[in-house]
Amino acid sequence: MRKLNLGCGGNILAGWENHDADLDITKPLPYKDNSIDFIFAEHVVEHTTTPDAVRFFTESYRILKPDGILRIAVPSVDKIYDLADGPYLKWHGQSGFGDGSKRKAVQSILLDHGHLSAWNHSILEACFFAAGFDPDKICGCGFSELEGHGKVIGDHNNEIETIIMEAVK
């Protein structure tokens, strides 16, 4: 089984091909058609424009084998807006990204951290569809041992910030 972990940072997964800045997801991916079983990209797609993200999803579709899985984790503007609570807002303010208000937390996800695109469930699903994935094979997912972002910002904060979705070729 061939698995790619793209934009891995320090989240190195055993048994995976782990790539960070060495592989530019805004360019054609250097893999043959139908050659990959699983692609995981955690908190990387928001660092591209939406058109570049759709191109990346299209490239992922090309290189995935039939029934291959693309798993994406991105910050969710909706979740931050809806779920931001006292502990999250306190952490956010103490992290230097705002003043502890919900408004600054939402602004930060949109404007800081090198983010070039904003995401929620509907946008992610529409972009998967535009890239060729069947809407019946797109599903939201819970957290698993793959995600490493919670190790950086804490599991509670990660649950508030992150949406995870899979698409099956």
Located regions from the model:
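S-adenosyl-L-methionine-dependent methyltransferase catalytic module, highlighting the catalytic core
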Residues: 52-61, 65, 69-168
